[in-house]
Structures are given as structure tokens and as C-alpha cells.
Amino acid sequence: MQVRQSIHSDHAKQLDTAGLRREFLIEKIFAADDYTMTYSHIDRIIVGGILPVSKAVSIGNEVGKQLGVSYFLERRELGAINIGGPGLIVVDGQTYEIGNEEALYVGKGAKEVKFSSIDRANPAKFYYNSAPAHTTYPNKKITLAEASPQTLGDDATSNRRTINKYIVPDVLPTCQLSMGLTKLAPGSLWNTMPCHTHERRMEVYFYFDMDEETAVFHMMGQPQETRHLLVHNEQAVISPSWSIHSGVGTKRYTFIWGMVGENQVFGDMDHIAVSELR
């Protein structure tokens, strides 16, 4: 488990490229037949990936000591979105088949969660977020058709995109976790521009569906102290509440967003005009 500490905006604006990447970029999400896990002190979110190829993978009790619990989801909820081939998630004996761009929400208290691929030649890739939970809500599979879609932007501003909200109050109840997958329209390269912050939630962006030579310039920082990170395929960026989070790609890409914090009102954000950015 990697641990990322919280960082003040006054400190962050003084960092060089290496420092920004060390604090905010998660460079490796997937490892074959294993899981990755990054624990952020910001709202206590956990971010990672699970890539079962030749065997099933589960997050065992080895993380219990680090989390101060007996097992991973004793006091947590989890959301996983599959960006690979068809896979299976078994939660305390209940099996869910999760295809590409399908998701599973797992409520607090699940003791055993196993991830596997149906075809090792086309393995599943489960990207997951986990947040502290105060009560147990039912496990639920969410397909792309069941997600709550919202199309924003315009071709003229190169930011037309469809936000597919998988884990939001309109689809299912959770304690605080929200997740979704945003697809850009052909020819659009910008996401979330004009940008925003939200004081009451933090967010993580996970970029994928990119070829080797594609990069996303991810904008971050306070609106009057912007910085950027160069992000490549299957990498994630931690965004504190004080930071904008927006990106532009050299070519097409897709991204998954996950939020935790004080509320789950999707529109609760502080919009920033482009003319106000520095």
C-alpha cells in the first residue's frame, strides 16, 4: 500500500515537476495477478486496480493492520468499474458477472471479495475506489445502460462529452462514494472546461483508453495558481478540494472519476470562468 499525505495549497504551488508527480500522480494502477492500492489522507479514499490473469485476486487481511480493521471492507464501501474483458466478482459467495464498462458497488461489511477473468487471453481490468462507510447498503451491479448519462459541452469548444454516472444517488444509495465514466465525442479533447472546484469533495481522475504516444495535460492547482501533470495511459491523479481538475489530450482518451466527501450532490461545485484562470 502506498500512502499519500494531505498537502496544503501553499505548499503545492512551490513544488517542481517531480514534486507534483510524487504528491498527486499514481503512475501504476494495474499489475498482473495482483492488486495495487494507494491510500490518500484526503477524505481517506483508496484507489487501485485489480488485474486477474491466471488466477483470482482478492484483497486479503494483510491490509487490516494498515487500516486498523480485521478485513478490508469492515468499515468501507467499494466501487469497481471493469475496463477490460469480461470478469467475475464474488462477494461472500454471491457471483456477479461484470463486463466491459460495467460496475459493481460493494457495501460495507463484505468479508471476501474475489476478482477473476473469464478469458485469460482477454483479462478483466477492475479499477476501484473505496471510501469509509457508516452503514451497509446492498451490493449492486450497474450496466452502462443503467448508468445516469449527461451530455455536456460542444463541438466548437472541443469538449463535448457524455458523463455516465454509475454510482450516484439517482442509481443506488451509498454512504459517500460516487463514481462514473466520461467518454469524449469524436474530435473533442478537453474534459471539464470551463473547470471548477468543490470544497466539499475531493476527486480522483483515472485516464485510460489511450495509445502509447498519447498524453493528457491534466490541469491542477488553485484557479490563480495552475500547474499541470503529464498523464499517460492507465494513470490516476488525486485532486484535493482546493484544486481544479481538467485535462486536454493529444488524442482520444476516456476517464473514470471518483469522488468522496461531505455530500453527493453532483452539481455542488464552484464554477470558474476561463478568463479567471492564471
UniProtKB/Swiss-Prot annotation:
UniProt binding sites for Zn(2+): 196, 198, 203, 245
The record's free-text note on cofactor binding: Binds 1 zinc ion per subunit.
Pathway in which the depicted protein is active: Glycan metabolism; pectin degradation; 2-dehydro-3-deoxy-D-gluconate from pectin: step 4/5
Domain of life of the organism encoding this protein: Bacteria
SUPFAM superfamilies to which the protein is assigned, alphabetical: RmlC-like cupins (SSF51182)
Catalytic activity: 5-dehydro-4-deoxy-D-glucuronate = 3-deoxy-D-glycero-2,5-hexodiulosonate
Cofactor: Zn(2+)
Claim: Isomerase is one of the keywords in the record: yes
Keywords on record: Isomerase, Metal-binding, Zinc
Pfam families from the UniProt entry: KduI (PF04962)
InterPro entries to which the protein is assigned, alphabetical: KduI, KduI/IolB_isomerase, KduI_N, RmlC-like_jellyroll, RmlC_Cupin_sf
Annotated GO MF terms: 4-deoxy-L-threo-5-hexosulose-uronate ketol-isomerase activity; zinc ion binding
EC number: 5.3.1.17
GO biological process: D-galacturonate catabolic process; D-glucuronate catabolic process; pectin catabolic process
Similarity comment: Belongs to the KduI family.
Function: Catalyzes the isomerization of 5-dehydro-4-deoxy-D-glucuronate to 3-deoxy-D-glycero-2,5-hexodiulosonate.
Name assigned to this protein: 4-deoxy-L-threo-5-hexosulose-uronate ketol-isomerase
Organism the protein comes from: Yersinia pseudotuberculosis serotype O:1b (strain IP 31758)
